[in-house]
């Protein structure tokens, strides 16, 4: 089995960490968990070090924003697979198993679970839905969402190829 890292970028997100990190820790036993801290001033780093000493905290020297923050932090992560997880995501039991299984296929370079709306678990999440595609004109679109219309999840997009992940 390949080594996997769950990597979360944080900036002043202590309340999100308090709410969502416990499930991430409990349901990610097969992974090493990292939090890249983008120079928070809200006590996030202290909270993690005190309450979750098994989480690897990578402290950046300033707020580099989303992409550069991840890129700088990932230089300190040595696992073979990176699972980039937003700090406001609630993971569920066994969430990593299908992702790990998919990465055992040498032709897989990216994978995304179906992302459901936090407040309405029957619907896809607006921004990520179920992965995405590029149409023939070069426009990106999500499976599970057409403009502002969000579909219910009835497993219609289970195990299908995607062009991009969120």
Task: Please state what every model-predicted region is.
Residues 14, 23, 37-46, 62:
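A conserved acidic beta->alpha catalytic loop
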Residues 60-77, 87:
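Glycine-rich, basic loop-to-helix element that forms the pyrophosphate-binding segment
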């Amino acid at each position: 089995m390949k080594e996997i890292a769950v990597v979360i970028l944080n900036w002043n997100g202590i309340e999100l960490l308090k709410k969502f990190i416990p499930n991430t820790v409990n349901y990610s036993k097969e992974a090493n968990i990292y939090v890249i801290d983008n120079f928070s001033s809200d006590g996030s780093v202290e909270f993690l070090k005190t309450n979750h000493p098994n989480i690897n905290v990578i402290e950046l020297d300033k707020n580099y924003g989303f992409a550069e923050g991840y890129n700088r932090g990932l230089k300190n992560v040595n696992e073979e697979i990176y699972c980039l997880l937003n700090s406001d995501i609630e993971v569920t039991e066994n969430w990593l198993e299908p992702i790990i299984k998919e990465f055992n296929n040498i032709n897989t370079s990216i994978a995304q679970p179906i992302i459901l709306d936090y407040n309405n678990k029957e619907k896809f999440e607006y921004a990520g839905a179920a992965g995405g595609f590029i149409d023939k004109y070069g426009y990106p679109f999500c499976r599970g969402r057409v403009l502002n219309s969000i579909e219910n999840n009835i497993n219609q997009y289970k195990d299908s190829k995607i062009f991009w992940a969120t």
